[in-house]
């Protein structure tokens, strides 16, 4: 991929998030610990293990419509991990539906339809829905950013 320069490759490892998680913060791991380039380390297995220990750890699904990251999609769609996924777009990185089509997530007609969609955020959303990510993946962030407040006493 390498659309954006990676400054400190070691920070892609979700284990660097242990301290904030131990302090009780809610944390979203970028790309759910998946690798960026062909020769980069794959940290997804660490992310999955960490979600078992840290209920406030989430992973974003930005750039999941590329082969190098998309290979983890089937695992991300399984419970309980799917409940820890949140939408991320990686905008302005371009979104293409080739991988979703080649993997059978979308048929040729849907692929062509979304490839012509000029709104890249809409294209990204529709392709990820076609890949199987449930609606909650795209709305979960609102609960995380605005936790419910205690009821006012009368």
Regions found by a protein language model. Name each.
Residues 1-43:
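Divalent metal-binding pocket/active-site signature
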Residues 26, 33-154:
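H/E-rich (His + Asp/Glu) clusters that bind or coordinate divalent metals
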